[in-house]
């Protein structure tokens, strides 16, 4: 079952790619429901789907609505796994959803603070020292982007935009905090994702998955 934010290109893109990949692997989408960003009452949607048979809810969107949807679903007795994307990665998901509701919840992300890779451990420690809080995936991506550009400048044949662009496109096996990445012919990053599992709203498990 997919419940998506119909006002978000991000959510619609995740939903379409999930549906394509899931059905190609033999899965069945039993239904699709929609809301728009800013909605706060999801009881009508959840009451409508409560009696349906489904193994999981795929919930592409951001934590603002996801936290409320998961909380309302659990209150209605819907205990099936909830799956999402990197839009779940915020401490406010716990504030909105509540610890009791945020079990059997999994989301794909760019990195996990549970990763014991020395690069990740150092990044988290340095970030905490400077800013007094734990970084999320968007902080890690920002850091990696800066390092990625610096690396490309160092490899470029000249210090001009065209040369740097070429160097960026030629990136192979760049060691980033969010994982080793290469750039494909369409300028997309090829890298592993991390699947994170929550226990009482806190990251409890993480597993890297490569294509």
Report the location of each language-model feature.
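Active-site-proximal beta-strand/loop segments in catalytic clefts of secreted hydrolases
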Residues: 2-7, 33-37, 59-63, 85-88, ...
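Sec-exported extracytoplasmic/periplasmic mature domains
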Residues: 19-27, 47-54, 71-78, 98, ...
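Segments of small-molecule ligand-sensing domains
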Residues: 129-139, 150-202
């Amino acid at each position: 079952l997919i419940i998506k934010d119909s006002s978000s290109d991000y959510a619609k893109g995740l939903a379409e790619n999930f549906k394509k990949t899931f059905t190609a692997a033999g899965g069945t989408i039993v239904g699709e429901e929609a809301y728009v960003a800013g909605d706060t009452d999801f009881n009508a949607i959840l009451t409508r789907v409560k009696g349906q048979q489904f193994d999981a809810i795929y919930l592409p969107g951001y934590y603002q609505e996801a936290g409320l949807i998961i909380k309302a679903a659990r209150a209605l007795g819907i205990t099936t796994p909830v799956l999402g994307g990197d839009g779940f990665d915020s401490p406010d998901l716990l504030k909105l959803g509540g610890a009791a509701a945020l079990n059997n919840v999994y989301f794909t992300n760019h990195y996990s603070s549970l990763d014991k890779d020395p690069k990740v451990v150092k990044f988290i420690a340095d970030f905490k020292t400077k800013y007094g809080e734990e970084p999320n995936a968007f902080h890690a991506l920002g850091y990696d982007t800066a390092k990625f550009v610096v690396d490309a400048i160092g490899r470029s044949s000249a210090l001009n935009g065209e040369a740097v662009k070429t160097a960026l496109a030629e990136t192979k096996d760049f060691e980033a905090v969010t994982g080793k990445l290469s750039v494909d012919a369409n300028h997309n990053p090829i890298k592993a994702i991390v699947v994170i599992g929550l226990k009482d709203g806190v990251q409890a498990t993480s597993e890297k998955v490569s294509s």
